[in-house]
Amino acid sequence: GSSMSYKAYPFFRDILINECIYFASKNKKLVRLNYKSEAYVGVWTEESVAVSFLTSRDIPFDKVVKMDVDRFATYELDELFDEQDHIIMNQTMEEEGHLLNVVAVTQEVMTELDKIRIKEFVQDVAKYDEVYGLTKKGSKQFILISENDSDEKKPHIMPVWSIKNRALKVRDEDFEECDLITIEGSVFGEWLDELRDDHKAVAIDLKTGVVGTIVSAQKLSNELTF
């Protein structure tokens, strides 16, 4: 594999900002585009660009599907693609688009998003001195969950939020049996030490559907400034 970085491309920044990508589907299959006389699945960072391109080229499609990039990385990537598969990013009337290894580009995007989110979380907590988490009724501890609902592993990930409305949304959609509570930064720091000693992990500002950035307690505690 090449050590080519995708960071310099405009699409990379678009995905970091909007956290979503677009595919076109026809008869429940992903639409493929021609690129140097081969056909690859087309991906776009803007819905309107996808629609106008497909329409102008008379490429048949039923709909353009918006996909959250965390959900894509967590659930769809392995379902839809093999290790060596390539996609065409942002093909338009003017541009032939970029041929990308889908696994490599997804990994690089998610690595970058993780870095950004860890930094923002640490800054928010340092500034507002509040960490939100979920508790089972009557408990004072934040809950632990497993990755991707897998029951094989004991729950080892503590979901925490610095963004209250996102925490509430996830509570309402995915954990309605739980209460949302808040603790001070210093208390979180102590809990993090315990998690680190137990080799556990932390999920930072998870989205609904329980997807997002999961990081070892060790790594997060290295980043803390409070």
Can you describe what each PLM-predicted range is?
Residues 1-226:
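Conserved NAD+-utilizing ADP-ribose enzyme module
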